[in-house]
Structures are given as structure tokens and as C-alpha cells.
A protein has these predicted regions:
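Residue-identity detector for glycine
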Residues: 2-5, 41
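Cysteine-centered motifs
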Residues: 3, 20-23, 28
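Positively charged N-terminal leader segments that act as targeting/secretion signals
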Residues: 5-8, 12
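Cationic, low-complexity basic patches in intrinsically disordered or flexible, solvent-exposed regions
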Residues: 9, 27, 33
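TRNA-recognition modules of translation machinery and tRNA-sensing kinases, especially anticodon-binding
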Residues: 40-416, 420-465
């Protein structure tokens, strides 16, 4: 085992046995990938890492359409795009997201660089935006700062349908204003994205998780309730009892959910300020005709939330609910990462999970790929140069055209043009070069005629406009 000539594939379990003494340096496989297939004794096929994906051209068009909707709606609400690094100091997420969160405890991709600094691939976007807000002194600009981002995140969790270890989120953050109007506007934007995509079966769920003052009171009564159920709780929830008992209410384990039925809710412990804030948020949502459901078990998985918390869930065929979007208020996070006391409110939306729902509901985004106006079919080197000149001039004018670069026969080029859905094929061969013309064929009607080479650009531009 260990010699490429003796095995067909290598799995992580086998890596510890490599290399063997009989291997030659050329045939020994020393690469930690999901599966490495050995071909003809020397060539190794390296596959993508488990939990990642290749977004191929056919699929990427749906991504572009989805991103276009998000850019448009966030712009209409007055948000500006921010782009932060994909890796940050580990301390940012430990302090910002919270030591007791699942993300920090078991899901982060953390490593040391050459300077022995602990770095982490970002598992979420809010902490990075708050760090950028502080570092770049955005608190000195007119408030609120309304920011949004679209980009990849990384978590080491079990991959499943619509869930990946590298995944993409749209996130919006409003920093600098503690006003229920902000909560209502952010929630309204999240709901409008779902409406713009025509997603069916969605439900907005809201809750108030209180502030540190009223959460201390709630913790006492909740802990007393949960201690009586301790032995029946899963191991993870037993650990949560000591660190953050509210997270027990968020457990997806069926037995834990059954045991926590009837647990004291945050509603019973809210201080007057938090209760007034939540009442005003609800009143504003009602004013805007945004339907919602109160969910007292909704606590979110991140430790930084205060007051308002919400999720948007979509009903699935099996009768379960899939949370596609979640967020809330985080009035202490900017201060946690070194800034001045600054209120904040935002949400994040999982793009892979949203695209899966769109696919499941057979919702198509946009009109798909727009084919080029024309294909240039050139036969021979001099014809290729002439065609390339025409191609370049048309592209500078914004006219979408394509050209064969494989040197294929005219028949093959016409077949490709027909497959690509172009309207015209411009044929230039040696005979056409001598006469100073090009043959233009209408691919749908089958008609063709001659156009002077010098007039080709102007003729096609008129057809495009």
C-alpha cells in the first residue's frame, strides 16, 4: 500500500500509511484531498475539497441574476457596498461572535501564519464590517452607515443539501442608530428580497432576546427550569447550561425540543426599555403590512444579539422549515471590537440555500444568457485577421459578437453559431477577401447576402441598435 501502481484511490484514512519504503518519489501520493484517483501509475486527479463546489457557467448565470436583484434592492434602500478581507485575526471572531457560540467552539477554519499570528477564514460577515467601521473611523461620518456585502464565508460543518463549508452570504448592516425604525426597515428589506424572487411559503418570525439587564433575570428562571431536565438533554445542551442556557432553546434535537416545551420565554422578563422597543418594531411592521409570527424560542446562534432577532423560514416538502435568512440587533458589538458604543442592526442571507429553494420551486431568474448578435466565420489566416479587426471594432462599440478560434470548417462554425443562438453569421473566406465583401447569413430565416468588408461594422451596429 502506498505505491501508485498498486492502488486505485487514496482516502484520508489511508494517508497515515503513506509513504511506504517501496515507493518511488514519482509515484507516492502525499496530498490531503477528499479522494485522489491514480491514473496510469503516475497521474493523480485532485478533486475539490468536501463541502466546496464548482459553480459552472450554466449555474453562474442564476448567481449573477440573484446578485443583481440584491444589488438593486439594497441600493433602493440606500445601502452602499463594503468589501472586507476573507481572513481576519482570530480574536475578532472570538470577541465579536462569542466564545460560547457553535461557530467559535467548533466551526472555524483557524491557522497560524509565518509570524505565529492566529488567523481565521471569516465564518460570518458582521464582525468584519464592525472591525472595518472602527478601523476606518466610519463612526466619524454622518450616521447611520448603511452597508451591505456579498461574498464567501467558511465554516467547518457537516455538508448537506444547500449547506457548504465555503458558502456565500448577502449581509446588510446599519450602524449608528438605535431606533425601532431601523429594525423595521432592515426586516422589510429582507422580506422584499423574498417577494422580489417570488418565493412561496415564506414566513417571517421575530422575537426579542432582551438586553444584558433583563437577560440576567431571564437566565435565572430559565436555568432553574432547565436544571430539572438536565439528564434528558443532549451533551451539547448540557454544556450550554453553564455557558449560555438560552442556546438550549435553539437546539434542533427533537428530544431537547420536547423537554424545553413550556420553558420561560424572554417575553416574561423584558425590561421596560426592551419591551417598548419591541412593541414599536411590531407596530411599524404592521404599518408597513409586513406579516410576521412571534417565536419566543428564536434566539439565533450568535452571542452578540440584543433586543430584536428575526428569521425568514420557508416551508419544505417534508413539512419542515428551512431558515434562509436571519439577523437582529447587536448594540454592543462595535464596542467589543474596540470602537465607541455604537448600535447596530442587520441580517445575513444564505445564497446557496436560497438558490436551492428557487430550484425546488422551479423559479427561473431573469431571461438567462443573451446570445451574441453575430458570429464571425473566417477561413484562412488573412480572413482571420480581417475578421478579428471587425470583431474588435464591434466590441469597442458594445456590440456582442463572437468568433471561432479553432480553425474549424465552415460547416462546423455554422453548426456552432446555430447552437449558440446568434442571429447572423458573417462568413469571410479567401474569395470574399479578394472581392472585398463578406457573406452575411440570417441563421433563422436561412437567407444570405453580401456586405462590403468596410461596411460590416456599421451594418451590424445598425442591426444591434
Amino acid at each position: 500500500v502506498g505505491c501508485a501502481g498498486e492502488i486505485k484511490s487514496v482516502t484520508p484514512a489511508m494517508l497515515s500509511r503513506l509513504p511506504c519504503l517501496s515507493c518511488s518519489p514519482q509515484s507516492c501520493i502525499l496530498f490531503e484531498s477528499r479522494v485522489l484517483e491514480v491514473r496510469d501509475g503516475t497521474h493523480v486527479s485532485i478533486q475539490r475539497i468536501k463541502g466546496t463546489q464548482d459553480i459552472l457557467p450554466e449555474a453562474s448565470r442564476a448567481w449573477q441574476e440573484l446578485e443583481s436583484v440584491m444589488h438593486r434592492l439594497t441600493g433602493e434602500y440606500g445601502f452602499q457596498e463594503i468589501r472586507t478581507p476573507v481572513f481576519e485575526a482570530t480574536a475578532l471572531f472570538v470577541r465579536g461572535v462569542g466564545e460560547t457560540s457553535d461557530i467559535v467552539e467548533k466551526e472555524m477554519y483557524t491557522f497560524e501564519d509565518e509570524g505565529k499570528r492566529s488567523l481565521t477564514l471569516r465564518p460570518e460577515g458582521t464582525a468584519s464590517v464592525c472591525r472595518a467601521y472602527v478601523e476606518n473611523k466610519l463612526y466619524g461620518l454622518p450616521q447611520p452607515q448603511k452597508l451591505y456585502y456579498i461574498g464567501p464565508m467558511f465554516r467547518s460543518e457537516n455538508p448537506q443539501a444547500g449547506r457548504f463549508r465555503q458558502f456565500h452570504q448577502l449581509g446588510v448592516e446599519v450602524l449608528g442608530v438605535d431606533n425601532p425604525l431601523v429594525d423595521a426597515e432592515v426586516i422589510q428589506l429582507a422580506v422584499q428580497i423574498f417577494h422580489a424572487l417570488n418565493i412561496k411559503g415564506m414566513e417571517l418570525q421575530i422575537n426579542s432576546v432582551g438586553c444584558p439587564v433583563c437577560r440576567a433575570d431571564h437566565r435565572e428562571v430559565l436555568l432553574a427550569f432547565l436544571e430539572r431536565k438536565r439528564q434528558g438533554l443532549c451533551g451539547l445542551c448540557q454544556g450550554r447550561l453553564e455557558r449560555n442556557p438560552m442556546r438550549v432553546l435553539d437546539c434542533k434535537n427533537a428530544r431537547c425540543q420536547e423537554l424545553t416545551e413550556g420553558a420561560p420565554t424572554t417575553f416574561t422578563s423584558l425590561c421596560p426599555e426592551c419591551r417598548d422597543h419591541f412593541d414599536r418594531v411590531q407596530a411599524l411592521l404592521q404599518t408597513a403590512d409586513v406579516a410576521y409570527t412571534l417565536n419566543p424560542r428564536l434566539v439565533r446562534g450568535l452571542d452578540y444579539y440584543r433586543k430584536t432577532a428575526f428569521e425568514i423560514v420557508v416551508a419544505e416538502a417534508a413539512g419542515t422549515q428551512n431558515a434562509l435568512c436571519g439577523g437582529g440587533r447587536y448594540d454592543a458589538l462595535v464596542e467589543e471590537v474596540g470602537g465607541p458604543p455604537t448600535p447596530g442592526m442587520g441580517f445575513a442571507l444564505g445564497m446557496e440555500r436560497l438558490l436551492k429553494v428557487l430550484s425546488d420551486q422551479k423559479i427561473e431568474l431573469g431571461e438567462g444568457r443573451v446570445p451574441p448578435l453575430a458570429a464571425l466565420a473566417a477561413l484562412g489566416q488573412s480572413a482571420q485577421r480581417s475578421a478579428f479587426r471587425i470583431l474588435s471594432q464591434l466590441r469597442r462599440k458594445g456590440v456582442p459578437v463572437t468568433m471561432d478560434v479553432m480553425g474549424r470548417s465552415l460547416k462546423s462554425q455554422l453548426r456552432t453559431a446555430n447552437r449558440d443562438g446568434v442571429r447572423y453569421t458573417v462568413i469571410i473566406g479567401e474569395d470574399e477577401m479578394e472581392r472585398g465583401v463578406a457573406v452575411v447569413r440570417h441563421m433563422l430565416e436561412g437567407e444570405q447576402w453580401e456586405v462590403g468588408l468596410e461596411e460590416c461594422v456599421e451594418w451590424l451596429e445598425r442591426k444591434y441598435r
